[in-house]
Curated annotation (Swiss-Prot):
Essential for recycling GMP and indirectly, cGMP. The keyword Ribosomal protein does not apply. It comes from Rhodopseudomonas palustris (strain BisB18). This is Guanylate kinase. InterPro entries: GK/Ca_channel_bsu (IPR008145), Guanylate_kin-like_dom (IPR008144), Guanylate_kinase (IPR017665), Guanylate_kinase_CS (IPR020590), P-loop_NTPase (IPR027417). Coiled coil: none annotated. Residues 15-194 form the Guanylate kinase-like domain. GO terms for molecular function: ATP binding; guanylate kinase activity. It is found in: Cytoplasm. The lineage of its organism: Bacteria, Pseudomonadati, Pseudomonadota, Alphaproteobacteria, Hyphomicrobiales.
Length: 219
């Protein structure tokens, strides 16, 4: 039974933005899927985009589908936490649903590149926890890209070239995980999330809780 005064409910916390980045083929997408499937209190960030909706996609679940004029207005009105132009289509993270989730203690998972991470950090540094996923070797990364059988050899060469540039930003991240084995990598990433959830500064009612404990001890 909880004693009178500030109880366990006062240990509520603010949510966090949990960012995973990696070169293509290093395991970021798989790890994101496993986190969403296995970890309570974590939801995937939903991006706004100007690209055309594909069959089977649902507005608000897969993306927020908007036209170019609306997207431009969102950027001008600071409604996006981060955004980028990719092959003439714009993608960005709406600020309002993320901030609403954080306010009630829900964590939001981001599967974005170093540029998006940089923008998030500039706008909300205290809420961002970033993890960069590394492959164990260049040979292993290339093998994974070929195993996916999604791209031509030319596209794979391009991805390998971009990977070198992406790796140059590893020091901008809070944590580094080398994905030798997907289960081990998941365990490490999950451990990071669990530890970050327990940080003192995210426990919004902790001061009141401790003061109440002190009063109880002094009676």
């Amino acid at each position: 039974m909880t004693a009178p005064g500030h109880g366990l409910e006062s240990l509520e916390r603010r949510g966090l933005m949990f960012v995973l980045s990696s070169p293509s083929g290093a395991g970021k997408t798989t790890l994101s899927r496993l986190l969403i499937e296995r970890v309570a209190g974590l939801k995937m960030s939903v991006s706004a985009t100007t690209r055309t909706k594909r069959p089977g996609e649902e507005d608000g679940r897969d993306y927020y589908f908007v036209d170019h004029a609306r997207f431009q207005a969102m950027t001008e009105n600071a409604e996006l936490l981060e955004w980028a132009n990719v092959f003439d289509n714009c993608y960005g993270t709406p600020r309002a649903p993320v901030e609403a989730a954080l306010a009630v203690g829900q964590d939001v998972l981001f599967d974005i590149d170093w540029q998006g991470t940089q923008q998030l950090r500039e706008k909300a540094r205290d809420d961002v926890v970033s993890v960069f996923i590394l492959p164990p070797s260049a040979a292993d990364l290339e093998k994974r890209l070929h195993t996916r059988a999604q791209d031509s050899d030319e596209v794979i060469r391009g991805r390998m070239s971009r990977a070198s540039h992406e790796l140059s930003h590893f020091a901008e991240y809070d944590y580094i995980v080398v994905n030798h084995d997907i289960d081990e990598a998941f365990a490490e990433v999950h451990s990071i999330l669990k530890a970050e959830r327990l940080k003192r500064e995210r426990r919004t009612g902790l001061t009141a809780f401790v003061r109440d404990l002190q009063k109880q001890l002094e009676r």
